[in-house]
């Protein structure tokens, strides 16, 4: 009887785990360039990453986050969140102790 009870509990736990695992919906677009850079990283990710609007805390060391909204996140981003819109609006939620270089010139583009 105890063995049957353990089997039932294990089956229920496995079913709940699989249900929770398959219920997660991920809205992702396949970008071959970011896929290749994730698989074969050569250290250029940080060099190619950029941010026009970077916010930092006043703590020492500062905690900085890029608040740019774009169609895709840069290749060095680990936590990219995209809105369900067309075109997609994505924002990187990584935090660092520094800001990336600016993507555009500080002059207003026409």
Swiss-Prot record:
One cellular component (GO) term of this entry: extracellular region
GO molecular function: serine-type endopeptidase inhibitor activity
Site, Reactive bond for trypsin: residue positions: 58-59
Entry-linked InterPro entries: Bowman-Birk_prot_inh (IPR035995), Prot_inh_BBI (IPR000877)
Maturation-removed propeptide residues: 29-42
Gene3D superfamilies in the cross-refs: Cysteine Protease (Bromelain) Inhibitor, subunit H
Source domain of life: Eukaryota
Signal peptide: 1-28
Residues the UniProt record annotates as site (Reactive bond for chymotrypsin): 84-85
Record keyword Signal present: yes
Keyword annotations from UniProtKB, A to Z: Disulfide bond, Protease inhibitor, Serine protease inhibitor, Signal
Disulfide bridge map: 50-103, 51-66, 54-99, 56-64, 73-80, 77-92, 82-90
Quaternary organization: Monomer.
Function: Inhibitor of trypsin and of chymotrypsin.
Family, similarity comment: Belongs to the Bowman-Birk serine protease inhibitor family.
Name the record gives this protein: Bowman-Birk type proteinase inhibitor
Originating organism: Lens culinaris
